[in-house]
Each structure stands twice: as structure tokens, then as C-alpha cells.
């Protein structure tokens, strides 16, 4: 199912998901350094593999996807299927509500 059919996202629930599943490798804080994964500040509207100062896989750079709700919704279902060769070792979020919630949080937290 596509993002058009996704349930409304709850950013508070999304923040909990971020803290438990994403924060060990990513930060959303402006000006913060990269962790194991890139800083996600300014994520929306950015092309994959282009954050300054982070060493991306060739797969991530070559995918050249623009991050927005729709692309993140598909990516977060199964990152390794969406970008084969990605360095991200996250299995994905299978539940549409979890993906919608996380995206709602990221939209606020990375702006």
C-alpha cells in the first residue's frame, strides 16, 4: 500500500519509535555530527546520499531518490529492498501506522 492509503501519523508515537529504533544510529538535531548513520536534519526534499560529511554507500548515492513522505513510507517498509546495498542495517517497519507515525515525527523534528 502506498503513502496515499496510509493512516494519519501521530508524531508523539513517532518520536517513541525514533528513540527506540533509530536514535542509536541517527540524530535529528541541527548542527549535530553524524553517528553510525547520517544526521537527518533537513531530510525532506533532500536527495539520498547527499548529506555533507557522511560516507554513503554507492547504492544510496546512485538511487538518487528525493526524501519525502511517499518515498520514506516505501523505504521504511524494507530499506534493503528499496536500496539494495544500503549500509543501513534496519529491517524496516512492517506496520503502516508505525511508518506513518515515524514520518510525522521526522517531518517536525528535521525541519
From Swiss-Prot:
Q: Which residues carry this modification: N-acetylalanine?
A: 1
Chief location category: mitochondrion
GO CC annotation, single: mitochondrial intermembrane space
Modification after translation, per record: Binds 1 heme c group covalently per subunit.
From the UniProt record, which GO molecular function terms apply? electron transfer activity; heme binding; metal ion binding
Its localization reads: Mitochondrion intermembrane space
Entry function:
Electron carrier protein. The oxidized form of the cytochrome c heme group can accept an electron from the heme group of the cytochrome c1 subunit of cytochrome reductase. Cytochrome c then transfers this electron to the cytochrome oxidase complex, the final protein carrier in the mitochondrial electron-transport chain.
Q: In which family does this protein belong, per the annotation?
A: Belongs to the cytochrome c family.
- The name of this protein is Cytochrome c
